[in-house]
Amino acid sequence: MNSLQVLTKKVLIETKAFSKYHEDDIFILQQLGLWWEIGPIGFCKQCKMVTGGSMSCSDVDSYELDRALVKAVKENQTDLIKIFVSWGAEINFGIMCAKTKQTKDLCIQLGADPEFLDVGLYNMFVYLIKQKKVLLAIDIYYDNISILDSFDSHDFHVLIDFVYNRFILYLDEKEEEMTRNTLVLKFWYKFAIDFKLTKPIRYLSKKFPHLDIWRLQTAIYLGNIDEVHHAYFQEDIRLSLNVMMFLACARPGNKLGIYYCFALGADLDRALERLISFNSINRKISGETRLCIEGSYLSNVYFCIGLGANPYTKKIQETIKQKHSNIMILLFSKKKILSPHSVLQNKILDPSDVRKMISTYENTESFYPFFSLAVKLIQQAK
């Protein structure tokens, strides 16, 4: 049963009784636990969002109810913990962040599973992935060393690899130098960029500005051109255009990322040279796996040529010969299917217009004869 004090706070928060306050009231509100970040705490029953001061539910700094609970648990705010649980917050999220025995015991009293920390951590991580709860996951795991250490090394890296290969996580620092704390932060940050979760991205970019370059790199690699546009033009974050293009080409089928780097001014011939140097046709891979790899690789080669890259430069021809790839030599001899595509020749930087153009291109492209020929040549080379 909640105390009169808790019930009173609950009513005051729900009615936003302190939406108008005097500066002299701030200290009192803080001492009473009625202050949230930048102003008196408020709660929207419809959106299930906890706010501070005049912020709206859509504000980047507003909190979903479960996140608000985690924050209250970390700060040992007993009354707020009770209030948030009464509104429907999941108490097991709270027990994962309890720093004191008293707060942990309170979580158990409010319904948390005493064995959750022993048996529920793995499933909770997977649940947060499925629900795309990026900010909640970061609130729970980041700087929560006791929780991170409770995963053995194998389980932890299985979780990190659950959705991704880890290539992009180590772009800006060596694997052996990265702490679990940083790795889990970048895992969820990358997740937000991959699924284009705008609010989490904006929140994290504000909180972790030291990852700005990495954020741009990740957006390029994943083809999130909305985020590339935002970082490049609204935040003035810069990378070498050719480095950006190499990142875009490193992901198979990344038409959006490749096109956007081209539109910004990256050198297409250098990109094609890099792609050719990555050629894996001569590797000993058999069956459908080999064809899948080659198809993905060739799609980027073909797209760069469609944008205007010249496959007949001396350097590219020399690279093909050095790779001893008869298949690439034969493919590049088919000049009728290796030419710029008319749909792709305009340089457009508005993300929505780029998507429309790429969609039009995909409905008209002639990649399939090229790919069919490649498959035929690969099969003949076996």
UniProtKB/Swiss-Prot annotation:
GO terms for biological process: taxis. It comes from the Viruses. Pfam families: ASFV_360. Plays a role in virus cell tropism, and may be required for efficient virus replication in macrophages. Belongs to the asfivirus MGF 360 family. This is Protein MGF 360-4L.
